[in-house]
Regions:
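Metal-centered catalytic cores of metalloenzymes
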Residues: 2-11, 31-99, 103-191, 197-199
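Intrinsic-disorder/low-complexity peptide segments enriched for small residues
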Residues: 7, 23, 56, 82, ...
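Secondary-structure junction/capping motif
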Residues: 10, 27, 205-206
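Bacterial N-terminal signal peptides
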Residues: 14-26
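Ubiquitous "structural anchor" signal
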Residues: 20-22, 118, 169, 245
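Primary mode marks residue(s) on the alpha4-beta5-alpha5 output face of response regulator receiver
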Residues: 169-192, 199-314
């Protein structure tokens, strides 16, 4: 997907998120209606065997059969007992007619395991609700192996699927008052690699820094080149750094998807002031050049990349 077609997305499970910009997709109290109502708060106990929060960053390009060219959505799921609560915000697609959870790996169409809704939603860019899932084995699999499942949205124009994404488990303990998520996409970004001597005496490109501008004016770099850690700074002074806790490959030629534990390093109020976890998803490009490099001829290379960053407030 062309990054210029992306916008900010926000949604919440167990929390109401206010719109923070005209381009934001959010669940807000003012937009509640009789058939699309922000869900009541869900309690997520520390024992992950009993409860969990999952997130999916849906893209049209993730569909096996081409989906909406600029389709994008952000979806949160809460599992508590045999109840699965969902909240989804979307843009770049028509109003969804159906939403499901499927069993299946990336690039593979799989069977529906949980129908979320099977009738058209009202216009408004979001939907939420809860379904009962009596299959305890399925719920256990969603918690223990979320990457083997994907979420998708269907529309009239794309009945086979407008946007989809694999599920990801949030790893940070979630406050019992609920969880909310904000998605910002890279507008312009590069993974920066330096030609460094390796233990065997050869030279190869290794991670040096990152430089990316995200929608919403967030600037993404390393706190210190080489040693890091990565950081995200909002225009309002709020900021977080991240420590990688999980890494998943995303195909040849693409940097890995990451799950990072967030540490507050900026202002106590602002866009990122309540972020506890960051996910880097839907990565495209950014991989270091392979082979031997010459530190005199090419000491530094900037490799363009795209990604969606999900900021979790807990």
């Amino acid at each position: 997907m062309n990054s210029s077609g992306k916008r900010r997305l926000a949604c919440g499970v167990g929390a109401v998120v206010a719109a923070v910009a005209s381009a934001t997709l959010a669940i807000s109290a003012a937009s509640a209606s009789s058939d699309v109502t922000p869900p009541a708060g869900i309690t997520v106990p520390a024992d992950s065997a009993r409860g969990a929060i999952l997130v999916a960053s849906l893209e049209g390009r993730n569909e096996v059969t081409a989906g909406a060219p600029v389709g994008q959505a952000l979806e949160l799921f809460g599992i508590q007992g045999n109840t699965l609560t969902y909240s989804v915000a979307w843009r770049g697609i028509g109003t969804p007619t159906e939403a499901h959870l499927h069993a299946g790996a990336r690039g593979v169409d799989g069977p529906v395991v949980v129908p979320l809704f099977t009738t058209p939603r009202r216009a408004g860019g979001f939907a939420s609700g809860a379904v009962t899932v009596p299959d305890s084995t399925l719920l256990a699999a969603l918690r223990s192996d979320p990457g083997s499942f994907y979420a998708d949205l269907h529309t009239t124009n794309f009945p086979g699927g407008a946007a989809r994404a694999q599920l990801h488990l949030l790893t940070h303990p979630v406050a019992t008052s609920g969880v909310a998520a904000l998605q910002e996409s890279v507008v312009l970004g590069s993974q920066i690699y330096a030609c460094i001597q390796q233990p065997d005496g050869s030279f190869a490109f290794t991670q040096h820094d990152v430089a990316a501008h995200l929608i919403g004016g967030i600037h993404h770099t390393f706190v210190q080149p080489v040693t890091g850690p990565p950081q995200w700074q909002a225009p309002d002074g709020s900021a977080v750094s991240g420590t990688v806790v999980a890494k998943n490959g995303n195909g040849a030629g693409n940097i890995a998807e990451l799950n990072l534990d967030a540490t507050q390093i900026g202002a106590s109020t602002g866009l990122l002031s309540h972020v506890v976890e960051v996910l880097r998803l839907n990565t495209v490009g950014g991989v270091a050049p392979t082979g031997v490099c010459d530190p005199q001829a090419t000491p530094i290379v900037n490799v363009p990349y795209q990604a969606d960053y999900i900021f979790i407030n807990g």
